[in-house]
């Protein structure tokens, strides 16, 4: 659902929910959001809570009625490690995707190297039958639970669990959070050279702190930086929020 909206240049509406907060999660389903971001950065990471949170995004009434056949709103997870820390925390990416998340939000995306490492860690090291996709897949093999959550066979999951728009038919989404002066400076190079970053989210709080204006998110300098991020994303055809 979310990727379909993005690839057709349609707005998508979502919200953050606390990992394990079933009231927040069920309300997000009932309110009709297009996606939800399960918060696992600042609120602590608990994979048992994440497993339960994902299950409560399955609206079985709508599934039985034939309206949908997967989790809706689309479940994304904001993980704890910053982009530069991902290489030493591969298990976080692996276990989050293995539970069936449809996408990841990655804090402090700042360099080309970190972005490419992220793309590689989210990609299986298998031959892609849909064309030449420039990614050295490093995702560990364990698709059984994710395939079950998606409601498909393992073969179908592996075929679909590729990164959009790197693979135009992919159903996984990486959203990089641009929230530092360094990230802003390197954003054009990241978006032009690493095609697996599907969208960008602005992090105004950390961005303000990085600019020496902690807590002053409405400062003109911070607002100008936010606008620059949006313009860069527009220039490179990458969805942003």
Regions found by a protein language model. Give the residues of each.
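Expand to "…catalyze enediolate/carbanion chemistry for C-C bond making/breaking, isomerization
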Residues: 1-241
């Amino acid at each position: 659902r979310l990727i379909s909206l993005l690839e057709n240049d349609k707005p998508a509406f979502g919200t953050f929910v606390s990992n394990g907060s079933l009231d927040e999660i069920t309300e997000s389903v009932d309110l009709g959001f297009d996606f939800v971001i399960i918060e696992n950065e600042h609120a602590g990471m608990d994979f048992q809570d994440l497993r339960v949170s994902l299950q409560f995004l399955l609206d079985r009434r709508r599934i039985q009625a034939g309206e949908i056949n997967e989790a809706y709103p689309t479940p994304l997870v904001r993980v704890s490690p910053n982009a530069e820390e991902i290489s030493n925390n591969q298990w976080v990416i692996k276990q989050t995707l293995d539970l069936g998340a449809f996408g990841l939000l990655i804090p402090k995306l700042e360099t080309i190297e970190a972005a490419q490492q992220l793309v590689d860690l989210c990609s299986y090291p298998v031959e892609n039958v849909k064309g030449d996709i420039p990614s050295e897949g490093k995702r560990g093999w364990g698709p059984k639970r994710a395939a079950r959550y998606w409601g498909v066979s393992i073969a179908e999951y592996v075929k679909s669990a590729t990164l959009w728009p790197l693979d135009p038919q992919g159903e996984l989404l990486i959203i990089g959070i641009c929230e530092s002066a360094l990230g802003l400076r390197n954003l054009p190079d990241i978006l032009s050279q690493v095609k697996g970053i599907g969208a960008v989210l602005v992090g105004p709080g950390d961005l303000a702190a990085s600019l020496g204006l902690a807590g002053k998110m409405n400062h003109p300098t911070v607002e100008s930086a936010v606008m620059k991020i949006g313009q860069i994303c527009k220039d490179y055809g990458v969805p942003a929020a």
